Curated annotation (Swiss-Prot):
Superkingdom of origin organism: Bacteria
Gene behind the chain: tlcA
Segments passing through the bilayer: 24-44, 63-83, 93-113, 124-144, 149-169, 184-204, 220-240, 284-304, 327-347, 356-376, 381-401, 463-483
GO cellular component, one term: plasma membrane
Bilayer disposition of the protein: Multi-pass membrane protein
Organism in which the protein naturally occurs: Chlamydia trachomatis serovar D (strain ATCC VR-885 / DSM 19411 / UW-3/Cx)
Principal cellular location given in the protein's record: membrane
Family: Belongs to the ADP/ATP translocase tlc family.
Compartments reported by the entry: Cell membrane
Keywords: ATP-binding, Cell membrane, Membrane, Nucleotide-binding, Transmembrane, Transmembrane helix, Transport
The protein's name: ADP,ATP carrier protein 1
Length: 528
């Protein structure tokens, strides 16, 4: 049965489950792949933070150094290797070749690398550097001191960009028809949030195993063993789903027609220089890129300070990891709620600008409250006493709420308005602009915040000392964000109006041509 011959869905089913029965053969393995990749992403994200922040002689100040000096170069090296392998291997072999290094490293980490950390880590050399260099270089020294943990952090960061953005979405975009994508992709988004709801409790469970362990057993080492075992099981499911898709789905003409899918335009590959040039020539794209950059920097500025507070409250890695598991779970709960009941309604009722401004305003308000609690904690004794907690714990909880609300509004509103901004553009602008923003904005958003924090760390010496300056930087960047969104809204409305007028004129011309054809038909019949 073809897609066009099938009955349309009812209103409720089109909202909850817009999938035909025969399409389950294609949807379920893709959904399971996306779920497992997202599950692993959460496991690795929470574990990498726990390793680095709670490591001996380390803390949250190491994160900006790792992101700028290790993650960014590693991403570039990976892309060079990937480009080379893509010319040598077929697509199926390439997928397994990319997955293999993650499987090997994360399999070895809990059984070989972590138990041998005392041998592998240059503790004496790091101590010597710490006695020579200023305190502002502590993050850099911590990166060297715990280099195996830094490698874990880098590969965890690469998992999201490589397996999620590149491998899964590249595979999905290649084999999915446009008519299917409109129905399938929203379900994949639900799968990502369901993964948060399951991975959070899994992290909590593995982090609390120490209660049943005997004396002399490293509880965090045991937790790592189970966390990485879960990761490897998910990788096995990912590999099995990918193999099954290639064996049974891509050989079914109902689901995959290479000739038909070749008509879909591919995104051009643009160098960094070409991306800069394209963005600078287009005010519309430059403003859109600024939105992405500002979000990345703002989240980075708040997260590192929050994680430094989190370490002070939970210095034990198991306690830290358990808290991060709870954080991931509630991020999933709030994200699902916001996506289902708030996101679309805000844009439909109040328009693009309101939807675009919700995320920066949320980051501004919650970030201001968080930084105020960190900076003026000694003056908040009345509030702390009324809540029956400590100033530190209050800052940790408010920071968690800030992160959860910022990320949930980002998923539901920021991403939606960003994608909507491409709609009124012509095909060339859509394709080239998106490619330029993926290259420039994504990298600047991730590394920009790290660069600001490194500069402040070197000057101020510690995260605590630089916190007031981070608050000022956050406020300044959000002002740029709000201004860019407001200016982009004017261009968006103008472009949308022009697009609608163009479509209306095209429809009128088509109607006029159709009427003329009907009028000429009787005359032709009379002549005949």
């Amino acid at each position: 049965m073809t897609q066009t011959a099938e009955k349309p869905f009812g209103k409720l089913r089109s909202f909850l489950w817009p999938i035909h029965m025969h399409e389950l053969k294609k949807v379920l393995p893709m959904f399971l792949m996306f779920f497992c990749i997202s599950f692993n992403y959460t496991i690795l994200r929470d574990t990498k933070d726990t390793l680095i922040v709670t490591a001996p002689g380390s803390g949250a100040e190491a994160i900006p150094f790792i992101k700028l000096w290790l993650v960014v170069p590693s991403a570039v090296v990976f892309m060079l290797i990937y480009a080379k392998l893509s010319n040598i291997l077929n697509k199926q072999a390439l997928f397994f070749a990319v997955l293999s290094p993650f499987v090997v490293f994360f399999a070895l980490f809990p059984v070989v690398i972590y138990p041998c950390r005392h041998i592998l880590h240059p503790t004496a050399f790091a101590d010597t550097l710490q006695s020579i260099l200023p305190s502002g270089f502590m993050g850099f020294i911590a990166m060297l001191r715990n280099w195996t943990f830094a490698v874990f952090y880098v590969l965890s960061e690469l998992w999201g960009s490589v397996m999620l953005s590149l491998m899964f979405w590249g595979f999905a975009n290649e084999i999915t028809k446009i008519s299917e994508a409109k129905r399938f992709y929203a379900l994949f988004g639900v799968g990502a949030n369901v993964a948060l709801l399951i991975s959070g409790p899994a992290i909590i469970w593995s982090s609390k195993l120490r209660a049943s362990l005997g004396e002399g057993v490293d509880p965090w080492g045991v937790s790592l063993y189970f966390l990485m075992a879960m990761f490897l099981c998910s990788c096995a499911i990912i590999a099995a789903c990918y193999w099954w898709m290639n064996r049974y789905v891509l050989t079914d003409p109902r689901f995959y027609n290479p000739a038909e899918l070749k008509a879909k335009k591919s995104k051009p590959k643009m160098s960094m220089g070409e991306s800069f040039s394209y963005l600078l020539r287009s005010p519309y794209m430059l403003l859109l890129a600024l939105l992405v950059i500002c979000y990345g920097i703002c989240i980075n500025l708040v997260e590192v300070t929050w994680k430094s507070q989190l370490k002070m409250q939970f210095p034990n890695p198991n306690d830290y990891s358990a808290f991060m598991g709870n954080f991931s779970f509630w991020t999933g709960v709030v994200s699902v709620f916001v996506m289902l009941f708030i996101g679309g309604n805000v844009i439909r009722r109040f328009g693009w600008l309101t939807g675009a401004l919700v995320t920066p305003i949320m980051v501004l308000v919650t970030g201001a409250v968080f930084f105020a609690l960190v900076i003026f904690r000694d003056h908040a004794t009345g509030l702390v006493a009324a809540l029956g907690t400590t100033p530190l714990m209050l800052a940790v909880v408010v920071g968690a709420i800030q992160n959860i609300l910022s990320k949930s509004t980002k998923y539901a509103l920021f991403d939606a308005t960003k994608e909507m901004a491409y709609i009124p553009l012509d095909q060339e602008q859509k394709v080239k602009g998106k490619a330029a923003i993926d290259v420039v904005a994504a990298r600047f958003g991730k590394s920009g915040g790290s660069l600001i924090q490194q500069g402040l760390l070197v000057v101020c010496g510690s995260i605590g000392a630089m916190t007031p300056f981070l608050a000022v930087a956050l406020f300044a960047i959000i002002m740029v964000w709000l201004t860019s969104a407001t200016k982009l809204n004017k261009l968006f409305l103008a472009a949308s109006a022009a697009k609608e007028q163009e479509l209306a004129e095209a429809a009128a011309a088509e109607k006029e041509a159709s009427s003329a054809a009907k009028e000429s038909a009787p005359a032709i019949e009379g002549v005949s």
